[in-house]
Amino acid sequence: MSKFAEPMARLIDELKKLPGVGNKSAQRLAFHILRSSNDDAELLADAVRDVKAKLRLCSICNNITDVDPCTYCANPTRNQQVICVVEEPTNISAVEKTRHFNGVYHVLHGALSPLHGVGPEHLRISNLIKRVEGGKAEEVILATNPTVEGEATATYLSKILKAEGVRVTRIATGVPVGSDIEYADEVTMQKAMEGRREL
């Protein structure tokens, strides 16, 4: 028997499905929502519905967007010849914070992880290859996370992309190994971008 009423137990169970939210955090969030005004609870519910209804993936780079193509791909002042490959859409803001990158992005939506059953077919690689085919790109910067999975992904992509004749670089290890670039500060990310190397 649950120690909470069924609607509260259900909300806690749903909140626990969010990344980084354990049982205690889910309980705190659920009770915060319960104490909130009905208007605030409705605003939260509307925001969740809007995200699901109005956001989609950019048809070019796979970034999450409400317009297609996204603002990066549609911006004529950005260098379309330089593509920065990241694992997740949240990684883009880490690169943008440096104010030293004016190219475009490609979001893989993950990294290779054989232990977790994530192979190349689970990532958004095929449209990256189409973007570089026939000399459409001068350089591809592999800005995957400095983890075992991120390094494996970078190595895999490097082999494929070099066969297309494009320059392939990897961000420098100014970003600590085992971390997520989403949490890198501007200076660290800037140094990582400046110190990228050929693969």
From Swiss-Prot:
UniProt KW keywords: DNA damage, DNA recombination, DNA repair, Metal-binding, Zinc, Zinc-finger
Gene Ontology molecular function, alphabetical: DNA binding; zinc ion binding
One record GO biological process: DNA recombination
InterPro entries xref list: DNA_Rcmb_RecR, Rcmb_RecR, Rcmb_RecR_Znf, TOPRIM_dom, TOPRIM_RecR
Annotated ranges, domain Toprim: 81-176
Domain of life: Bacteria
Gene3D superfamilies found in the cross-reference section: 3.30.60.80, 3.40.1360.10, 6.10.250.240, RecR Domain 1
Coiled-coil regions listed: none
Zinc finger map (C4-type): 58-73
General function of this protein: May play a role in DNA repair. It seems to be involved in an RecBC-independent recombinational process of DNA repair. It may act with RecF and RecO.
Similarity comment text for this entry: Belongs to the RecR family.
Name of protein: Recombination protein RecR
